[in-house]
């Protein structure tokens, strides 16, 4: 049975007619030519197109389905791109992309050399600000609004669209605190797209607060009308002000987060009533900002499988839209995330001090099973990476041994806390850093390329890079024995398929493992010092070149004995890592060799000094010079 929604009440058009309507819109200027009563039909056409298109490319589906009417209404009412829209995170921006001239390009969404899955300034003038990480939109829109005010452009609107999940990020609250300073001086509109979801289910007291909000709009409107009537009569106006002070708690609805920042709040209103949205937004344009409009939407709206399971359809691969995502056959290999999940559950059975923390990435970080089995030793702190790390530091001070499960790209957001609250105090916090290295379709904002460089520079920090499935278990066990800060970084997806034979065994801290030893003659002797995934990627190269291959295991402490031995016994050293070359593991090797007075020629392979775009991971590895063919050629050239 076709799972696409047929219940929405819109003017009856055939699928071909809806398609024709959508194809007539190549910009918001075209959109504004439609009669407002046609907009529900357009919403249906957009959803049909999104489901068909994303089912072929993969992408963030359920969030964009939920924000369809919102995207239509914003571009219909506001003069984009002169008026600027900032889409927080960007998961919900596909309708925006389609309406702003990228309908045909959606076939290349997140593909190599295709359009980005997120708003990107270099891609379109309608993408006012690049987003992909959470909670940045209000700060960015506020900055633009202040700049325009300084430049005399006081008629330009700046709109931040932020979800209820993203509003739990501290940066968003900081921006609200700042925005309230401007009272009514700026044309700043904050749309709270409230769909009761982030990626994982919502967490924290703020989510509960949003769920209970009632509208202050009627009271606010009544107050403004009363002002206009009473102010011309001084005696009545003075009396009204005295009465207001005594009755405000009686007449006003419960205080909201926004009113506490002196920001006018309206809502909640139905985010799927597109004609109502248009009318409301037109009225708001007559006011000065900052203004918050609270819009209630349903994540996955219009496609029943996504409505029923918005988390499953948050980020999807290719699927059949007629039947929806179907259970796949049991995988032959476990992902590194699944291996981490197995390890943390097994370890928690043995060690009652283990406490798991995630900043709103329960599913992605592999903690679903842990939460089921150990709910009292688990906390999703919402989109609050900084708090997650310092919360872990506090636990560690009081005899609990915390594990912070976090993506590499999101660990960047908590760097000061890692330095100030964990490393300086030498606290036993284990960072399980998922998505380390190139992640593919999510692109430059989500690759985990900087963690080696920014972690190895910290005193007291141990940095570990498992190379395969069994090493993952061994090195997590080893990390758990430390009573100091430690980070274990591992890539997205699966490894080479090595059987996991380790149970509770550990390895010596700072000791590497020699995978093979060269028998090449002097002058042709190469030692490859590989970190993490580069070990199995270069196994065949080492065999073809008859090179020594060392699984370094530890970036810090570096196995200095192994490095000295390799330098003394080989004509060429090669380091390889799936991370930024500047300041990375190869740099650590060269720093040590320099201090030791060793001058053996060394080639460093890592990610070059550029931000890597989205695309197929293997293509990106090749473009970064990390594919076996390129590395082998460079080694052979160095030996010749």
Task: Please state what every model-predicted region is.
Residues 102, 108-140, 150-155, 182-312, ...:
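Thiamine diphosphate
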Residues 49, 73, 323-330, 334:
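Nucleotide/pyrophosphate-binding catalytic subdomain
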Residues 18, 60-182, 354, 358-359, ...:
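Cofactor-binding active-site loop characterized by glycine-rich and histidine/acidic residues
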Residues 2-99, 257-263, 268-277, 291-294:
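N-terminal amphipathic, basic-rich helices that act as targeting or association modules
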Residues 318-322, 456-501:
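Helix-enriched interaction subdomains in cytosolic or periplasmic regions
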Residues 158, 162-175, 179, 366, ...:
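Extended, hydrophobic alpha-helical segments in both membrane/secreted and soluble proteins
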Residues 35, 164, 468:
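Short, conserved phosphate/pyrophosphate- and ester-handling motifs at nucleotide-, phospho-/glycolipid
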């Amino acid at each position: 049975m076709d799972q696409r929604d047929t219940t929405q009440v819109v003017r009856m058009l055939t699928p071909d007619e809806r398609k024709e309507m959508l194809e007539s819109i190549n910009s918001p200027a075209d959109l504004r030519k439609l009669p407002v009563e046609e907009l529900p039909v357009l919403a249906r056409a957009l959803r049909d197109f999104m489901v068909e298109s994303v089912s072929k490319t993969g992408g963030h589906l359920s969030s964009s389905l939920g924000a369809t009417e919102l995207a239509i209404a914003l571009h219909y009412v506001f003069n984009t791109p002169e008026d600027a829209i900032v889409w927080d995170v960007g998961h919900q921006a596909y309708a925006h992309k389609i309406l702003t001239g990228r309908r045909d390009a959606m076939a290349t969404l997140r593909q190599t050399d295709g359009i980005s899955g997120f708003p990107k300034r270099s891609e379109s003038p309608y993408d006012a600000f690049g987003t992909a990480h959470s909670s940045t939109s209000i700060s960015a829109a506020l900055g633009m609004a202040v700049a325009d005010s300084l430049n005399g452009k006081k008629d330009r609107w700046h709109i931040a669209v932020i979800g209820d999940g993203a509003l739990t990020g501290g940066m968003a609250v900081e921006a609200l605190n700042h925005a309230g300073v401007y009272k009514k001086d700026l044309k700043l509109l904050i749309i709270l797209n409230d769909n009761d979801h982030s990626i994982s289910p919502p967490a924290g007291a703020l989510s509960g607060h949003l769920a209970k909000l009632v509208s202050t709009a009627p009271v606010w409107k009544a107050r403004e009308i009363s002002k206009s009537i009473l102010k011309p009569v001084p005696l009545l106006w003075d009396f009204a002000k005295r009465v207001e002070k005594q009755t405000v708690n009686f007449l006003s609805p419960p205080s909201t987060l926004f009113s506490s920042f002196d920001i006018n709040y309206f809502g909640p209103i139905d985010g799927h009533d597109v004609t109502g949205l248009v009318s409301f937004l037109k009225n708001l344009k007559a006011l000065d900002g900052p203004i918050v409009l609270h819009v209630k939407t349903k994540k996955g709206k219009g496609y029943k499988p996504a409505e029923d399971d918005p988390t499953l359809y948050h980020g999807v691969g290719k699927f059949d839209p007629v039947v929806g995502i179907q259970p796949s056959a049991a995988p032959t290999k476990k992902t590194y995330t699944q291996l981490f999940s197995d390890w943390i559950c097994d370890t928690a059975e043995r060690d009652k001090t283990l406490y798991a923390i995630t900043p709103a990435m329960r599913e992605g970080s592999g903690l679903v099973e842990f939460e089921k089995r150990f709910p009292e030793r688990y906390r999703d702190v919402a989109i609050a990476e900084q708090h997650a790390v310092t919360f872990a530091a506090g636990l560690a001070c009081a005899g609990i041994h915390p594990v912070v499960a976090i993506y590499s790209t999101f660990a960047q957001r908590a760097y000061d806390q890692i330095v100030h609250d964990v490393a300086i105090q030498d606290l036993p916090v284990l960072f399980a850093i998922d998505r380390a290295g190139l992640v593919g379709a999510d692109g430059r904002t989500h690759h985990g390329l900087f963690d080696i460089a920014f972690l190895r520079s910290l005193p007291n920090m141990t940095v570990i890079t498992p190379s395969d499935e069994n090493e993952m278990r061994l090195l997590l066990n080893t990390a758990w024995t430390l009573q100091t800060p430690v980070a274990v970084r591992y890539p997205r997806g699966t490894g080479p398929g090595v059987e996991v034979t380790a149970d509770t065994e550990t390895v010596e801290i700072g000791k590497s493992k020699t995978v093979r030893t060269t028998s090449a003659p002097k002058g042709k002797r190469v030692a490859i010092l590989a970190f993490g995934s580069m070990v199995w990627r270069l196994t065949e190269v080492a065999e073809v070149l008859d090179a020594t291959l060392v699984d370094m295991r530890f970036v810090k402490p570096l196995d200095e004995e192994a490095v000295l031995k390799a330098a003394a016994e080989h004509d060429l050293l090669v380091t390889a890592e799936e991370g930024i070359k500047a300041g990375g593991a190869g740099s650590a090797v060269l720093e040590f060799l320099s201090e030791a007075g060793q001058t053996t020629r060394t080639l460093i392979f890592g990610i070059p000094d550029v931000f890597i775009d989205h695309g197929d991971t293997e293509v990106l590895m090749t473009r970064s010079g990390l594919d076996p063919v390129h590395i082998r050629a460079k080694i052979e050239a160095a030996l010749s």
